[in-house]
């Protein structure tokens, strides 16, 4: 999990999985003390239910925990979301490359880490997800090449944003073709 809203969503995912009996480990990429807002509240809830959180603030701590992570059945990528504007560097770049090198399915929250919501280009390393659960509406890099290969299968989670709000946003509008939609045309 990251330190922003995407990480906060990841904390909610971790809590939900634990409550459903799934063995779950949480890693924060960055310094835990920097987490604020809703993400901080969701992190505190993890503490209240006894879920330990491991801080990975540098390359050394990543190397220390990499072997444990390489044994997981699945990885939830909730590191960076729609706020990414520049290519990954340093620890984040290393982490994305290492995760991509594992034969473990990755589920990304909103967008795979390393992709920018504003572009379908891939500027450097980005997580290659098997599945992306994106919030509210599809994002450009999930449906347009060359970035779309990083998103894997895409599920748009309805989070209660009225369609009038989405259609009123500036920029391109995207609609996913679904089986149900095509069925109505045949």
Label for each model-derived stretch:
Residues 1-75, 80, 87-90:
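A cross-family phosphate/adenosyl-ligand binding-site feature
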Residues 71-186:
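YjeF_N-associated NAD(P)HX repair module
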